Amino acid sequence: MATVQEIRNAQRADGPATVLAIGTATPAHSVNQADYPDYYFRITKSEHMTELKEKFKRMCDKSMIKKRYMYLTEEILKENPNMCAYMAPSLDARQDIVVVEVPKLGKEAATKAIKEWGQPKSKITHLIFCTTSGVDMPGADYQLTKLIGLRPSVKRFMMYQQGCFAGGTVLRLAKDLAENNKGARVLVVCSEITAVTFRGPADTHLDSLVGQALFGDGAAAVIVGADPDTSVERPLYQLVSTSQTILPDSDGAIDGHLREVGLTFHLLKDVPGLISKNIEKSLSEAFAPLGISDWNSIFWIAHPGGPAILDQVESKLGLKGEKLKATRQVLSEYGNMSSACVLFILDEMRKKSVEEAKATTGEGLDWGVLFGFGPGLTVETVVLHSVPIKA
């Protein structure tokens, strides 16, 4: 008869959790950032607020965003005038949209990831679904299981209302699942739609306007598993270690509240300052075991909360301009897609590394870091190891 320890040992994987495929998706409708202030103030019937519109234009100009994708079209907004007001009861209308569209967009990303992985979906043992867009029972995890046709016995984890740090959280959870369940293949999906946060402007709530200038829609999916079968699976990144921390003196720095008016967004403190002041501590703790202290010697995937965060992190750590190139590229092309962003950046980096004939998936470097920043202020840190690119 097997002992508990023998059973335990048999359940564990031998190697580290590894990203085996990545897929991304966006709604069909996109907006150009340069034209967005005119469109936004027109659709919300706020054109009389000329000073506020000028402020919003400056926010959009400084955002370093060229384009964003949005499920909400002019037609949908005209049918739902309460969503265009600043604080009108509109949660039902928002929920009706997101409970359908969040799993649908997630399915698009997941289908691409499964196709790249190349294995039957019946081999998926666990599903992690993450969204800050709407809440329902049974959740988006259940809806996605049905939409894709996963096994009814797939083990599901639903993460709601985590916000912008959650791209790190899902990888942390996927790592623990893959390494503690031999043969596990974890499908991770982050799907975000701004229909829950879109609202008209108010000169009493400028931080809400910041959100209107930055947030975009997108979904990303990854497959994570340990001990890949390299005859049929292609490793992309190894997840080496993970941590989560709440930054000191950051209570209320970023808040979101789900109300009758939808999800409201509040920035109460100097978020870029708080992150840049504390980031070196997180890096030092994560990389001390590896003897790494030169932050230019690793590849970087940082949640692009906004350009000011990236600028201050770059300056504080003395990072070379190219270090945040993939991060800035995703911000420019998609805006801030909350939890999905870092997975889009992983995808961007592995593709560019191949295009530019780099030696590894990490821009030719071996070690890298993935950061999620969000409400709390919470920071997720993931240490990544790249994989050699075979010519």
Swiss-Prot record:
Tagged with keyword Acyltransferase: yes
Entry's EC annotation: 2.3.1.74
This protein's pathway: Secondary metabolite biosynthesis; flavonoid biosynthesis
Enzyme class per UniProt: transferase
Keywords recorded for this protein, A-Z: Acyltransferase, Flavonoid biosynthesis, Transferase
Pfam families: Chal_sti_synt_C, Chal_sti_synt_N
Family designation: Belongs to the thiolase-like superfamily. Chalcone/stilbene synthases family.
Residues at the catalytic site: 164
Function description: The primary product of this enzyme is 4,2',4',6'-tetrahydroxychalcone (also termed naringenin-chalcone or chalcone) which can under specific conditions spontaneously isomerize into naringenin.
Underlying gene: CHS2
UniProt keyword annotation of Acyltransferase present: yes
Example GO BP: flavonoid biosynthetic process
Gene Ontology MF annotations: naringenin-chalcone synthase activity
Name by which UniProt lists this protein: Chalcone synthase 2
Catalytic activities: (E)-4-coumaroyl-CoA + 3 malonyl-CoA + 3 H(+) = 2',4,4',6'-tetrahydroxychalcone + 3 CO2 + 4 CoA
